[in-house]
């Protein structure tokens, strides 16, 4: 999204998405480091090709909000599994991500 916005001369939009991209990389590192700290193996699977063009910034932000809601559902599912398994360490780690998703959705919603 950042590259598409940049190509369209939308530097502010491009920067917003670039900052989000960097933040998502940090989140991935937190998950990977946590998995390693639990003496488990991190498996990185191939990522499917992603969309690279949008009709407008509004469409970009709408897609972003939709995606963030999907991520929220996945994190909530992980939190439910951790609670059910009485995995308190994972539950504790996931609290930060639950809170973070509230902010992520709000940030995308604010841009719409």
List each language-model region with its residue ranges.
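Acidic/histidine-rich alpha-helical segments that form the ligand environment
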Residues: 1, 33-34, 49-112
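Conserved alpha-helical segments that form or flank metal/cofactor-binding pockets of metalloenzymes
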Residues: 2-46, 108
